[in-house]
């Protein structure tokens, strides 16, 4: 009887499970990639250019075209150049203009991050940009991972990011990849509570996503599939299939969690 009840419960909860699996954000730098990611089942897109350098602000024409073609939520990178994350006054003004262009292009959010010359989170400057971006939510990007990776330092930096008013933090837990930083990401998730969303990212692929999801217990994940397929020569059909596989892994991981709760 107990086995029957569990099977019945899983069947009844399947539609809910499909809707409540962790959210998947995919980074893209072309319109074709954005369309492929949407077809593959992504929930949100991060739009940027020059992914090989970590991403910079895309051309406004790409923002507008993506908005016309894509129904998903789109967040856009606000980064005036590649390299470090310590910006001059002129670069800060450029970031402000880029935020305004993103607003006019009807983007759903922005992704940014400014550090101090010593490598800490520049709370004042970031807070200024967060305020300027409203009502668009702000994701603080992996500039967060540039500093020391010990737990105490990560907690302190997390508090600084929260103080900026950002809604989301993209991080690999102070490591090059999310897989390496799983334990620290989990600590950040616990420490953040409901004050900010922790978004694990960094070489996330179908082969390691299940483990990362189970270890971090995060509610959102970020991937560019860069570790799976060569860019930019990959076929977009393969990119779409890769996104679809990431979605499948998240759904399966959620299903396993449900079954574990039943046992």
Where are these regions (language model features)?
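Hydrophobic faces of well-ordered beta-strands that scaffold small-molecule active sites
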Residues: 22-26, 45-47, 74-78, 110-112, ...
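Hydrophobic, well-structured mid-protein blocks that either form specific transmembrane helices
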Residues: 103-164
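Tryptophan (W) side chains
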Residues: 5-8
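Glycine-rich phosphate-binding active-site loops on the catalytic face of alpha/beta enzymes
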Residues: 46-56, 101, 105-117, 166-181, ...
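Active-site mouth loops of central-metabolism enzymes
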Residues: 19-29, 78-96, 115, 140-153
């Amino acid at each position: 009887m107990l086995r029957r009840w569990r099977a019945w419960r899983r069947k009844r909860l399947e539609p809910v499970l499909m809707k409540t699996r962790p959210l998947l954000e995919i980074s893209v730098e072309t319109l074709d990639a954005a369309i492929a990611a949407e077809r593959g089942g992504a929930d949100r897109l991060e739009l940027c250019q020059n992914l090989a350098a970590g991403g910079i602000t895309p051309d406004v024409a790409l923002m507008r075209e993506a908005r016309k073609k894509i129904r998903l939520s789109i967040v856009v990178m606000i980064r005036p150049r590649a390299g470090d994350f310590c910006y001059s006054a002129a670069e800060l003004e450029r970031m402000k203009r880029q935020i305004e262009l993103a607003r006019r292009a009807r983007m759903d959010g922005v992704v940014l991050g400014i550090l101090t010359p010593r490598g800490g989170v520049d709370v004042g400057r970031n807070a200024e940009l967060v305020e300027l971006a409203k009502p668009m939510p702000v994701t603080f990007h992996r500039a967060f991972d540039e500093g020391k990776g010990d737990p105490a330092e990560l907690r302190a930096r997390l508090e600084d990011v929260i103080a900026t008013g950002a809604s989301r933090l993209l991080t690999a837990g102070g490591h090059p990849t999310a897989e390496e930083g799983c334990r620290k990401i989990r600590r950040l998730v616990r420490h953040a509570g409901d004050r900010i969303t922790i978004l694990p990212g960094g070489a996330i692929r179908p082969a390691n996503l299940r483990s990362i999801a189970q270890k971090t217990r995060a509610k959102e994940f970020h991937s560019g599939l860069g570790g799976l397929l060569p860019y930019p020569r990959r076929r977009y059909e393969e990119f779409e299939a890769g996104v679809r596989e990431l979605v499948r892994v998240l759904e399966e991981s959620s299903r396993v969690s449900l079954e574990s709760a039943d046992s």
